[in-house]
Amino acid sequence: MLQRIREVVSLANNPATDAVTKKQALDYLEQMKSDPNAIQIFCSMLTDSGSDDLCIFVSLQILCDLVAMNTSVDLLFVKNSIVEFLRGKINRNIKDAEFLRNKISELITRLFINMYGEVNGNQWNTFYKDLIALLSIDSLLTGPSEHFSPLGLDYFARICIQINSEVADQTFLRSKDEQTKNNNLKDTMRLEDVQTLVTIWFNCLKSLIIQQQNFELAVIILSCIGAFISWVDITLIVNPEYINIIYGYLDYSDTKIACSQCLCEIISKKMKPVDKLTLLSMLNLTDKVASIGEDDIDVYEKLAKLASSVGLELSIILEQCNEGVQSNETLEVANAADQQVLNQVAPLVLKFMSHEYDSVTEQCFPFISQYLAILKKLFAIGGKPGTAVAINSKRQPLDEAHQNFLVSLLNVCFEKMKIDDSSESNSEEAIEEFNDIVRSKLKVFQDSIAVINPNIYLENISNHIQVSLAGTDWTVLELAIFQMHNLCESIRNNLFGLNKTEISTSAATQLMHKFMALLLQNSNLFQMDNRYVQILFFELVVRHYTFLGSDTKDAVSLLNIFCSEFGMFNKSEKVILRTWYLFTRFVKISKPHLSVSVLSQLVSKVMPLLVIKTVTPSVDGSEDCDTTFDSQLYIFEGVGMLIGANADNTYDILDQVLTPLFTDLERCISLQSQSPSIVLQSHHILMAIGTLARGTHMGLVPENQVNNALVNEKLIHRTLIEKFSNIAEVVLVTFSYFNKHETIRDASRFTFARLIPILNGGIVTFASKLVVLFLESDLKTMEMNDFLGFLGQMVHTFHGDENFYDLFDNLLTPVINKLHILLDHLESESNESNWYGEQNGRENNGNDVSGARTSKTVVVTDSYRDKILLKKAYYGFLQSFVTNNVTSLLLSNRNRSILPTILGDLLSYNPQEIQETSTMKLALNVLVNFIKFFGSGGCTDVNDVHASSIGKLDGLNEYFITRTIPLAFEIPFKPQYKFNINDGSCRVIACDLSRVLKEMYIQSGGGQDVNSNPALKYLTEVYFPQIQLPSELGMELIQMLITQDTKAFEKYYVTLINRLTS
């Protein structure tokens, strides 16, 4: 048996073993746990001469798993086995690999958890006594000693740490029962054994200092002390003799880190403020830390953390003493803590904070954050009026000591905010990390100081910016711009606590105007070839352009800077792409009204960037092949906005941009080639033209009025309409030539959508040709979705235009027919996919669990999903007729023949479609509105200007009655629809179905006389008898339909479904 286990362990651990065999090996070991003799077998493995380290490790792991689920007899067997196993190791001084020592310690810890204390029936109450004797460390009970086993002490410390992890570590979530058990174990340890543990640790540390060796043992003992301190009596450890011994290990390079961590844990122990202050005063850690000389970075990190921890604890004392009602004692404690921070801790922490390594700096952040938070509560005179910090501040006068601290902290922030001089262009990740972790936190500290005392902040940061702006090194100038951004944000967020009316004339605002002017005049800056400086400059002036002043000259100066090698013509791709976007962003938010002469010069400068150069898509279809073009579109939009907003209302300059595009487009068409590169070039040109049109429109019309036809008609000049009519013609010619290509169809639709608000009613002529071209094209599903959305937008924009009405009257039937060709194709594909799925399901039945199909399984293929999306777009298109009061189009002479098809789409659903709640809700909403507006047979929409000219359709009311009423009863009750009224999505559908019934009743004449209302008559005389609904229930439903309003009937209908299906 043992040999078999060894073979299985070897197989499971062999990298060459195949996955199937490895799984079988692991399954075998898992099954062995269920063997009645598993405990005995794996205990035997520990001492079997044929077991290697791996077999022993696996055996120990399995025994760990078994300990928690076995009887006291088995536990005793495991205890005796592991004790003898470990005794042999100690007696022969066999120091196994660390992973084995940890696993042995884990097994002993598991035995402790299940055998120690009253909670475990006192099965092993002499645990620590036995362990100390077993590990040959009992000499440490009486004092320092040389006569103990270092290996035994190593095991003892590891076991202590693992026991603490199990019973006291708050990192892991435990059940209430587990937590109760752990608390009982800790209580027993406090009463019986903690004093012994503390004594052994103390004598061990004392012995190792005397011996000046085995410092690796000191490290693990210090870890023990740090782990246990949170829940043992602190006086056992915090006394002068014990602390002095711990302190001593700060003097040794091998133990500095562990000692620092241990001291951090000690001072973090929860206690009353006065007791904590006494502890910190006794420890006097800052003097000790300050006396330590140069060391490696890891040690510095821990020492910085230790100094910060002292400051953090003092800050907590200060906060606690300032809460609630203060006594003389609390005031004295608070003052003593504050003085200790200012005189001892702060200088040391600020020294660590200014260290060249950011990892050391970061250790200081918790203390600085906590202390500044307290200072805000005590001294803050800033902060946005009405915010918590402004309301809750005690506004005490800021004394000189605290002023000095704030100034010193600001100076450290200024120093540490500068990017490392050694940073090269390839260190982008390091700089981003620096910005995210260090700079962002330092900015928060600066902001806190601004809130505490705006004058200190403003005086120091303004001097800092002034000096930095005169620098020639890129890191200094970059920092100056960064700090200008911070100052702008301080003003924007009103950290200075000013009234709104005072902000624009405040000293801070005046300073920013001055700094912005200096920045634009800084010749060193614009000669600097550094992408961090360049991008940060443009980010600053765009985000905070209001500080540039209202003079158009500033805007022109900045636009010229954009159009230089410093900006949009930069050699760095990252700068180029970012500035192209920021250029347009700046134009959009500032909307400068430039004269045509100035504008012409700017456009001439930008023209090289408006040349479209395509990159042929790679064979693998990568989307990264032409990423530049998307950013290039921003320039077209920005140029369009400048032209649209020009001060002279002259738009001939548009030709300067459009003519090259038209020429290039003519070239593409004249080549008589439809190669991928030519098609892509044509697509890009169309997109550029559409984007230019959008920009021009945005420059002319206020952003919130771009879709207002009256405003557009008033503001858009006749010459512009002629130019954009010409654009529409160009788009149609291009579309006609390249209509087989989806990208061209997309670009054409995009451009036309941008022309609609500009040309208004003038677009109709062009739109009719565009729609015909689309209908003649081989559209894909997603294209049809977008096309229907485009048509819906046109319905919304031009529903009051007579020409539009005629256009849609002519095109509605062809559009629906085109739509049905696509729907039929998708239906065929979906059915075919389902057939293959069923065949595969039969073949896999019984062999593959994933082949099982329940009665509720919905097979979702790509074709099915496309069909659902297309129907959703279709219903949205139909809804646009309702929303814009043109449902009469559906009843016109031209479209009456297609109406049954449309209504059939709204009245026929398969079980899969019922599960698509959002689509069903939209469809039923359209159906309800159709019933509302022409359910009686004639168009009754009072807002539809063509309603009176549409004759009544005979039989339409009867059609609605005979088709909608069954729908309202079949969907909830027919088994194939799997309708569950308790499901939220089904309940939504039920509510919509109730509205269908209610609206059908109203449009059939309403009233209380069943015989005079065709809908009620059909229900009582035809449908209810047909479905064999009890007459009492039928009359109840009729009565509710007559007497209840829509909301009340909806509630009744849902309740009825519940009653009939429960």
Curated annotation (Swiss-Prot):
It is found in: Nucleus; Cytoplasm. InterPro entries: ARM-like (IPR011989), ARM-type_fold (IPR016024), Exportin-1/Importin-b-like (IPR013598), Exportin-T_C (IPR045546), XPOT (IPR040017). Keywords: Cytoplasm, Nucleus, RNA-binding, Transport, tRNA processing, tRNA-binding. Signal peptide: none annotated. Pfam families: Exportin-T, Xpo1. GO terms for biological process: tRNA processing; tRNA re-export from nucleus. GO terms for molecular function: small GTPase binding; tRNA binding. GO terms for cellular component: cytoplasm; nuclear matrix; nuclear pore. It comes from the Eukaryota. Belongs to the exportin family. tRNA nucleus export receptor which facilitates tRNA translocation across the nuclear pore complex. Involved in pre-tRNA splicing, probably by affecting the interaction of pre-tRNA with splicing endonuclease. This is Exportin-T. It comes from Vanderwaltozyma polyspora (strain ATCC 22028 / DSM 70294 / BCRC 21397 / CBS 2163 / NBRC 10782 / NRRL Y-8283 / UCD 57-17) (Kluyveromyces polysporus). The lineage of its organism: Eukaryota, Fungi, Dikarya, Ascomycota, Saccharomycotina.
